[in-house]
Amino acid sequence: MENLQPESVSRETLIAQYFPGQIEAIQRYADFLVGAGIERGLIGPREGERIWDRHIFNCLPITQLLPEGASLFDIGSGAGLPGIVIALARPDVKVTLIEPLERRVEFLNEVVAAISSDLIEIEVIRGRAQDVKKSANFITARAVA
């Protein structure tokens, strides 16, 4: 996969490059972030304008490092970044979103239901990472204190 940079090509080109077959789903997710994500305080009110560059495209570099068929935990998933982006860009990767707060889990479940397809595998677990009784090949955490 060619390594395209957000500042050198159009948003549509990047979406087509990194989300083949998932274009509608990633756009639906971006809409969720800008709408319900801001309303529920999962992302800041000024983040809507930069949702693609600062949040979605920022999650893409790791997708090129994951081997085919890997499993991944996204700890403290919050609004689903980077876990949902990884799942949509790499449908072969099984992604588990781990989040302790109920309101965030509700948001994640709504997003997963809205973007789900037979091509992607995303599981949402309410809990703390140390309490999860499963394992994964890789772990991500973004803005976790």
Label every PLM stretch briefly.
Residues L60-A141:
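Conserved SAM/SAH cofactor-binding pocket of Class I
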Residues M1-G69, F73, R103-E106, E110-D118:
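Class I SAM-dependent transferase core
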Residues V144-A145:
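Short beta->alpha connector loops
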